[in-house]
Amino acid sequence: MVNDTRADYDHLMVESDEALCASVRAGNRLAEEVLAARYHRLVRSCARPYFLAGGDSEDLLQEGMFGLIKAMREYEPGHGASFYTFAETCIRRRLYSVLKAATSGKHAPLNHAVPLDPSFFDANLSFANADPEMLLIDREKAASLLENARKLLSEFEVKILGYYLEGLTCREIAETVGKSPKSVDNAVQRIRRKIARQLLSGDISNG
């Protein structure tokens, strides 16, 4: 039985996103697991700007995964957008929704996750409308905000931030830069503190 499950999983691993989504809609839990593993890094990448601004990593990842699961169950290939684009939209829209609720106190565990600078928060505004054409605009705005944040960091911290926002784990970053996971984690915490101070001062979006 275990071998059969392993064989089924291995078979699904080589399936396209579109085929896996069809299997998910048909009730295949293994297909859902495969897609969740395939896109977990995207979820981390979408959530991490908010984590750097003071949010709880586990809460944000959980909400992002809810957005990914919604994408799996609702994706329709005939509508033009790739699954990657649709999934990113759903993940960011979910994060935007819960963070917006947090500002009104409706989601207490995430209250501290809301970026303190309105323009940082609004960088994800159009995702609430699930318009894939707005993805590039939002990426450019977020990139501008993060570029200002990078001015606060050391050369090593800038390197770590780049990999971190790509969704790599601390262990993966450590292997890439030749440092210990502890060193990378310490750098991430320094980055969070520096960004939080600048968000509080209101300087981070002014360049």
Regions found by a protein language model. Name each.
Residues 17, 40, 92, 142, ...:
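Short, leucine-enriched amphipathic alpha-helices that occur as contiguous helical runs
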Residues 24, 39, 43, 60-71, ...:
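Short, small-hydrophobic-rich alpha-helical interface motif
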Residues 124-159, 166:
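Amphipathic alpha-helical segment used for protein-protein interaction
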Residues 74, 92-111:
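Arg/Lys-rich amphipathic alpha helix in sigma70-family domain 2
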Residues 52-59, 73-90:
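Short, aromatic/basic-enriched loop-to-helix "N-cap" motif that marks the start
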Residues 1-59, 151, 169, 199-207:
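Extreme N-terminal regulatory/targeting segments of RNA polymerase sigma factors
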Residues 157, 170-201:
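DNA-recognition helix of helix-turn-helix
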Residues 45, 85, 89, 162, ...:
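DNA-binding alpha-helical recognition surfaces that contact promoter or target DNA
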